[in-house]
Amino acid sequence: MTNASRDEERLRLALREEPDLAPLLAVLDETIRVLDENGVEYLLMGGIASSCLGRERWTHDIDLFTRPAEAARVLKTLAAEGFETEETYPEWLFKARKDAQLVDVIFRSGGNTTVDDEMLRRAPTVPFMGRLVRTVPPEDLVVIKAIVAAEHTPRHWYDALAIIAATELDWEYLLRRARQGVRRILSLLLYAQSNDLPAPSWVIRDLLSLLEGA
């Protein structure tokens, strides 16, 4: 690439318009409405939850988290409202689409994490761009993102750090959830502590003890 081409690319990026979120938000509102009206249990995760609990960032889809036994009902409920649906990966993920917007129906996440009663009890209701949404608890989101973070998805790592920085976490609860990914959580918290984020030393010691007892 020539210097002129690089300058043109920098200018293009500098002038780039913010993405139009109106179509995504319209489908989000419809998804929430129809699931709530039908009494379907679900939580929001992914970029929307990360924006609510940690740092604002753009997202291109809607990530729902539901019980494995509830996933087919979520899909059926959305299909009845005109969503296109597919059982993409029967082990962990279904998909729905409407007006070119994607809804991921996740029922098994990193570390074999699934929705349970305690997660639903702890789920916060938080504002997101003018509406209220119910998200995965921040502690669970930190654990999930630490486990699924990879070289090609560094956003998960930085989402988790942002949640640690922005949210008062229940560390006892996080420790219970961390048993499915002790090494990942430990590495995240050590990195967080090295950057002066509020990662308690006693939590790190307890994670080390879990490793030693494994």
Which residue ranges define each predicted feature?
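Compositionally biased terminal segments of proteins
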Residues: M1-A214
